[in-house]
Swiss-Prot record:
SUPFAM superfamilies attached to this UniProt entry: Coproporphyrinogen III oxidase
Protein known as: Oxygen-dependent coproporphyrinogen-III oxidase, mitochondrial
Record organism: Homo sapiens (Human)
Keywords for the protein's UniProt record, in alphabetical order: Acetylation, Disease variant, Heme biosynthesis, Hereditary hemolytic anemia, Mitochondrion, Oxidoreductase, Phosphoprotein, Porphyrin biosynthesis, Transit peptide
Site residues by UniProt (Important for dimerization): 327
Length: 454
C-alpha cells in the first residue's frame, strides 16, 4: 500500500492520509524517538518538510581524477538506473567504511552510542521531515555522522522532500504516492509519484541507496570507462545512492525538468576505495521562452560559480552533448548542466558542489511553472507538446545508458526506471512544423544549442 500525502495548506506541512509500505510499524523500526513518535501518530498526523536551502561554501575548482576518461559520452548513464536499479552497473558503486565516533566532553548527557542526546534528537527531527524514513537504519547513520555515505543519503532525502513540497504547493490538489521498496541484495529506495494533478501530468522524485557486490558485467563496464578495479575472489563491494526526478506539467507552455545527483564508492581487494559523484539538471520546454531559459541557466550557473568559474561552461557543454537524439539531429531540450566521474579535489569539496546544485533545483524551476501553469493554450499547442514528449521517450529508451542498462539488468526495479516517461506522448508520420512558426523556433534551438548566460 502506498502512502498518500495530502496538502494541509500552503505551508510546509502535510497530512498522512493513509498508511503504507508496511504501515507505521515498519517505520518505527528505523529507531529514534522522532521517527518512533511519528509512526505512532494517527492517520491525520502532521509531517513537516525540511527548511529552506542553507548557505554554501566557497571551494576550489572541481575536476575529474586520474581514473576518468573521455568526455560526455563516457560513463554517463545512471540517472534512471540508480533511481530504481537493483544490481546496477551504470549507477556507481562502493562500500563505505564505518567511522567510529567519540563522545563529546561537554556536560551534555550522552546516549549509549556515545552521541549527545541533542544530536540524536536533531537527527531524528531532521529525518521526520523526509517523505519516508531513511533507507539506512537510523542507528547506523548516527554511528557515522561524518561519513560521506551518511551525508549523501541525508542530502538526497532532503532534496526529495523539498522538491515534492514545492510541487504539491504549486499543484494545489496534489497527492503523492510514496512507495518504499527494498532490494534483497542490499539497500532500497523511496519513489514519490504524482499523476494527473491539477498542474502536473506526472511528477516523479525517487531516491535509492543500494549496496552489495558489483556484478562482473558492471565491473567490465566501469573498466571500459578507465576505472582500474582489482577484485578479491571475483567480488567488488559497492555502494550507490542518488536522487532522480522527471516532472511533466500539463500546460504546454510550462517546461519539463529532469535532474539527478548521485554518489558511488567501490572497495578493491587491497582495501583501496574509489569514489566519484555525478549528476545534472536540464530543461525541456515545448515552446521557447528566452526569459525562462536565461533564468534556468543563470540559477545553475550561480550554483556552479560558487565552486569555480570554469564549471558551468564545461558542464553546460557536456549536457548539450549528452542529451542528443542522434537519429533526429536534435537535443532533447535546451540543456542545463551534466557531469560524471567527479573525484577531485576532495570528497568534501565535490559534495558541497553537488549540494549547491541540488539546492538550485527548486529556485531554477518552480518560478517557471508558476508563471505558465495557467497560460491559455490551443489544441495545436497541446498536440505539439505530445509530439515533443515522443522525442523525450525516444531519448530515454534508445540513448540513456542508465535506462538501457536497467532494463536489461536482472532484479532491476522497472517501475522506478520507467518513472521518467510521460503519461502521454504522440508520434505522427512525417510531421513538420510550418516555417517561421513557434514550433520551428524551438527546433532551431534544439538543433543549434545557445549560450544563455555568460
Amino acid at each position: 500500500m502506498a502512502l498518500q500525502l495530502g496538502r494541509l495548506s500552503s505551508g510546509p506541512c502535510w497530512l498522512v492520509a493513509r498508511g503504507g509500505c508496511g504501515g507505521p510499524r515498519a517505520w518505527s523500526q528505523c529507531g529514534g524517538g522522532g521517527l518512533r513518535a511519528w509512526s505512532q501518530r494517527s492517520a491525520a498526523g502532521r509531517v513537516c518538510r525540511p527548511p529552506g536551502p542553507a548557505g554554501t561554501e566557497q571551494s576550489r575548482g572541481l575536476g575529474h581524477g586520474s581514473t576518468s576518461r573521455g568526455g560526455p559520452w563516457v560513463g554517463t548513464g545512471l540517472a534512471a538506473a540508480l533511481a530504481g536499479l537493483v544490481g546496477l552497473a551504470t549507477a556507481a558503486f562502493g562500500h563505505v567504511q564505518r567511522a567510529e565516533m567519540l563522545p563529546k566532553t561537554s556536560g551534555t548527557r550522552a546516549t549509549s552510542l556515545g552521541r549527545p542526546e541533542e544530536e540524536e534528537d536533531e537527527l531524528a527531527h531532521r529525518c521526520s521531515s523526509f517523505m519516508a524514513p531513511p533507507v539506512t537504519d537510523l542507528g547506523e547513520l548516527r554511528r557515522r555522522p561524518g561519513d560521506m555515505k551518511t551525508k549523501m543519503e541525508l542530502l538526497i532525502l532532503e532534496t526529495q522532500a523539498q522538491v515534492c513540497q514545492a510541487l504539491a504547493q504549486v499543484d494545489g490538489g496534489a497527492n503523492f504516492s510514496v512507495d518504499r521498496w527494498e532490494r534483497k541484495e542490499g539497500g532500497g529506495g523511496i519513489s514519490c509519484v504524482l499523476q494527473d494533478g491539477c498542474v502536473f501530468e506526472k511528477a516523479g522524485v525517487s531516491i535509492s541507496v543500494v549496496h552489495g557486490n558489483l556484478s562482473e558485467e558492471a565491473a567490465k563496464q566501469m573498466r571500459s570507462r578507465g576505472k582500474v578495479l582489482k577484485t578479491k575472489d571475483g567480488k567488488l563491494p559497492f555502494c550507490a545512492m542518488g536522487v532522480s526526478s522527471v516532472i511533466h506539467p500539463k500546460n504546454p507552455h510550462a517546461p519539463t525538468i529532469h535532474f539527478n545527483y548521485r554518489y558511488f564508492e567501490v572497495e578493491e581487494a587491497d582495501g583501496n576505495k574509489q569514489w566519484w559523484f555525478g549528476g545534472g539538471c536540464d530543461l525541456t520546454p515545448t515552446y521557447l521562452n528566452q526569459e525562462d531559459a536565461v533564468h534556468f541557466h543563470r540559477t545553475l550557473k550561480e550554483a556552479c560559480d560558487q565552486h569555480g568559474p570554469d564549471l558551468y561552461p564545461k558542464f553546460k557543454k557536456w549536457c548539450d552533448d549528452y542529451f542528443f537524439i542522434a537519429h533526429r539531429g536534435e537535443r532533447r531540450g535546451i540543456g542545463g548542466i551534466f557531469f560524471d566521474d567527479l573525484d577531485s579535489p576532495s570528497k568534501e569539496e565535490v559534495f558541497r558542489f553537488v549540494q549547491s546544485c541540488a539546492r538550485a533545483v527548486v529556485p531554477s524551476y518552480i518560478p517557471l511553472v508558476k508563471k505558465h501553469c495557467d497560460d491559455s493554450f490551443t489544441p495545436q499547442e497541446k498536440l505539439w507538446q505530445q509530439l515533443r514528449r515522443g522525442r523525450y521517450v525516444e531519448f530515454n529508451l534508445l540513448y540513456d545508458r542508465g535506462t538501457k542498462f536497467g532494463l536489461f539488468t536482472p532484479g532491476s526495479r522497472i517501475e522506478s526506471i520507467l518513472m521518467s516517461l510521460p503519461l502521454t506522448a504522440r508520434w505522427e508520420y512525417m510531421h513538420s512544423p510550418s516555417e517561421n512558426s513557434k514550433e520551428a523556433e524551438i527546433l532551431e534551438v534544439l538543433r543549434h544549442p545557445r549560450d544563455w548566460v555568460r
